[in-house]
């Protein structure tokens, strides 16, 4: 018996099951009958849906936990609480290379899944690539409603990517090296001024990459490296991503979810809106400069967009601001995450740190000699960064696609149509079936020295795979090499005791990084 507002509910379904009914002076028999009818109908529909999901659904033969097969609530709970990546890894260890992680979704972590899900059109009768799951990427849509490079259709993606391709070419990145060096040099001097006092490396790295990205994207640095504490603008980026993911998972179960998402972000997505507005303001200033300066020779990203606007590839003003905001989000957060992870694992493996530091200092007599071209010749540095990308991928989560109506072959299995499918980075990279001792930081696995001959190195795709793979990988590699090279040339680095378990982190698509306290001691003679 349950009491609500002074009334009792009672209805006998059988001699074994009793449910109370509302009764009172204002409720007649028809109201009681209607209430009972709707209750029975609702329960019948609910249990029918649960039974269908578990035993009649087209994915019924794919393994996975019962709760995940019954309801999407299982997936949404783990994702909205930052636990999905580790849970998915756990499920793959238990159930194998394909797991049903929601009633309508499969996770893969082996074989040809990368190419089958994210590759070109080689195995699909429709001749089309698998499309992004629209609602999952709703959080990536810019607050102005414009779909950016991350959330656009194939057609729009190709057009936008074409505009930005020149900006991310090796030639363009090489032309920007002086800009990168200016910000990296300033970070080194700021850290040197601390005289070896433990400091949060996450903040320094994030501020450095954020200043680089704002300078490259908007023609003006945000100057966050000058801050002694976290710059609110830089910190807003992660908070905005977290808010968007949480909103998406809450609204999966709501009617009119697309309309409700817009209202929810306006009401509670303060960080995301503030970050976006700041990007818009600076983008407008940069575009105005280009309009008044006929000889606009700044080699930043905006210059390439402005040049494209004089051709048939033109982007609308709202598309420009939406994509610039995305560049600020992704361009700074992901590179800083990787570098922080790399520093952590280096300091936890002193013999690797000592070897890499010695090699860099032997190769360069002065910091002026350090450049991305020379650093690219250091195969051990490349191996260290590749291992960091494997064990601590900047984008930790999955990016789901939807199978076409006729279904698709994925890793040798037929998957029915209209099913979400994905590769989870953590589950792929930490699988003992793919990598020997997957939780150990071992750069040697990338050097072909035979230490782990069974490793499936091709399964590590930190920049994703296929036509929608990360367009900024050339810039990312330049930043990673330059920042790591300059830090290790200038400083002896040591992990502070309070950060011993720094890698025990939750994820909201990207890592929720706590402070990484490191002592940067100037090397002797510096």
UniProtKB/Swiss-Prot annotation:
Keywords noted in UniProt: Glycoprotein, Heme, Iron, Membrane, Metal-binding, Monooxygenase, NAD, Oxidoreductase, Transmembrane, Transmembrane helix
Coiled coil: none
Topology of the protein relative to the lipid bilayer: Single-pass membrane protein
Pathway where it operates: Mycotoxin biosynthesis
CDD domains tied to this protein: CYP60B-like (cd11058)
Annotated transmembrane regions: 34-56
Enzyme class: oxidoreductase
Subcellular location as annotated: Membrane
Ligand binding (heme): 470
Alphabetized GO MF terms: heme binding; iron ion binding; monooxygenase activity; oxidoreductase activity, acting on paired donors, with incorporation or reduction of molecular oxygen
A Pfam family of this chain: p450
Cofactor(s) listed in the protein's UniProt record: heme
GO CC, one annotated term: membrane
Residues with attached carbohydrate: 309, 418, 434
Superkingdom: Eukaryota
Catalytic activity, EC: 1.1.1.-
Family: Belongs to the cytochrome P450 family.
Entry function: Cytochrome P450 monooxygenase; part of the 2 gene clusters that mediate the biosynthesis of fusicoccins, diterpene glucosides that display phytohormone-like activity and function as potent activators of plasma membrane H(+)-ATPases in plants by modifying 14-3-3 proteins and cause the plant disease constriction canker.
Protein name: Fusicoccadiene 8-ol C-16-hydroxylase
Source organism per UniProt: Phomopsis amygdali
Gene name per UniProt: PaP450-1
């Amino acid at each position: 018996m349950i009491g609500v507002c002074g009334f009792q509910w009672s209805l006998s379904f059988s001699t074994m099951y009793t449910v109370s009914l509302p009764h009172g002076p204002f409720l007649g028999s028809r109201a009681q009958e209607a209430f009972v009818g709707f209750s029975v109908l609702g329960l019948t529909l609910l249990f029918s849906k649960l039974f269908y999901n578990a035993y009649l659904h087209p994915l019924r033969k794919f393994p996975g936990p019962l709760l995940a097969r019954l309801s999407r609530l299982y997936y949404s709970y783990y994702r909205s609480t930052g636990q999905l990546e580790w849970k998915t890894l756990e499920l793959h260890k238990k159930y194998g290379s394909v797991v049903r992680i929601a009633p309508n979704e499969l996770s893969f972590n082996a074989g040809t899944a990368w190419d089958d899900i994210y590759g070109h059109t080689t195995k699909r009768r429709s001749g089309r690539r698998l499309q992004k799951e629209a609602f999952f990427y709703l959080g990536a849509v810019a607050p102005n409603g414009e779909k950016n490079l991350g959330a656009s259709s194939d057609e729009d993606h190709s057009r936008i990517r074409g505009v930005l391709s020149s900006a991310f070419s090796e030639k363009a990145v090489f032309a920007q090296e002086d800009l990168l060096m200016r910000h990296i040099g300033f970070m080194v001097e700021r850290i040197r001024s601390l005289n070896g006092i433990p400091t949060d490396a996450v903040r320094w790295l994030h501020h450095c990459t954020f200043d680089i990205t704002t300078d490259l994207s908007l023609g003006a640095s945000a100057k966050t490296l000058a801050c002694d504490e976290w710059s609110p603008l830089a910190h807003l980026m992660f908070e905005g991503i977290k808010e968007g993911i949480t909103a998406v998972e809450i609204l999966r179960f709501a009617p009119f979810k697309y309309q409700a998402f817009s209202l929810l972000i306006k009401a509670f997505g303060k960080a995301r809106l503030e970050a976006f507005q700041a990007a818009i303001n600076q983008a407008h200033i940069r575009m105005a400069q280009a309009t008044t300066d006929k000889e606009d020779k700044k080699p930043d990203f905006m210059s390439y967009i402005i040049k494209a606007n004089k051709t048939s590839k033109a982007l609308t003003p709202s598309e420009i601001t939406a994509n610039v905001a995305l560049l600020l989000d992704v361009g700074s957060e992901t590179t800083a995450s990787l570098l922080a992870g790399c520093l952590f694992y280096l300091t936890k493996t002193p013999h690797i740190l000592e070897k890499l530091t010695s090699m860099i200092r032997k190769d360069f007599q002065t910091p002026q000699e350090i450049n991305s071209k020379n650093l690219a010749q250091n195969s051990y540095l490349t191996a260290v960064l590749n291992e960091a990308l494997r064990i601590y991928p900047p984008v930790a989560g999955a990016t789901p696609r939807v199978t076409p109506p006729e279904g698709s072959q994925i890793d040798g299995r037929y998957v029915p149509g209209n099913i979400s499918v994905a590769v989870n980075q953590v589950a792929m990279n930490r699988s003992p079936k793919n990598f020997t001792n997957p939780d150990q930081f071992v750069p040697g696995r990338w050097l072909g020295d035979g230490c782990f001959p069974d490793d499936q190195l091709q399964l590590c795709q930190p920049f994703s795979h296929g036509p929608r793979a990360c367009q900024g990988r050339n810039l990312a590699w330049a930043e990673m090499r330059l920042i790591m090279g300059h830090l290790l040339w200038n400083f002896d680095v040591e992990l502070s005791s309070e950060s011993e378990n720094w890698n025990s982190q939750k994820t909201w698509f990207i890592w929720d990084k706590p402070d990484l306290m490191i002592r940067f001691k100037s090397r002797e003679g510096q």
